[in-house]
């Protein structure tokens, strides 16, 4: 069956923050770049939202690994998590670590063991506050660290390598305990988040499916469905989003400049 690619209806997903470029990854290899153009589960796709998509590879990742969520810094460095423990460049990284790829070398941007994250936990949300500021992270199961109970739909602020605050508090917002965040991006702001979940659900009165991307304006608590990846390609009927990053027009980063 031929793959059907559709241009997203941007007007249908309009919001206060203009996104100039969207990056996303899937949990399985699929032709999500274009018809007959494959991206593996170690890759991500860079999409200009005008019909042009490009496969991006992080060199050196083992074929058996899956790229979870990721953050692309303005200098081109990539911060990301993997679904398995791996040795890269002589350093061992746990699934809850955040790996930094910069100039051909790998290092730890977040040390899960030092932060008190138990073994068996996976990091599945990686972003930065504002553009190149503090890390925002999410994890796949509930655990306690540094005085916080961290839940799968929480977004945690990291200060000096430790959990310091909840940027998104799932319990306080009344989220279903079944919800798990698998992708986040702050869109170059300290006020907004782009979010992907690993299942369908409802948040803030907005009902969504597995491959929808939502945004939330944190000061007002208003949620909006921004993108339905199923409208980008029919391959999203079998592939599932597990990483998002966005390039925002920083002129409007607070939504009112």
At which residue positions do the language-model features occur?
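Bacterial N-terminal signal peptides
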Residues: 1-9
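Sequence/structural signature of beta-propeller domains
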Residues: 13-249
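Non-transmembrane domains of secretory- and envelope-associated proteins
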Residues: 251-253
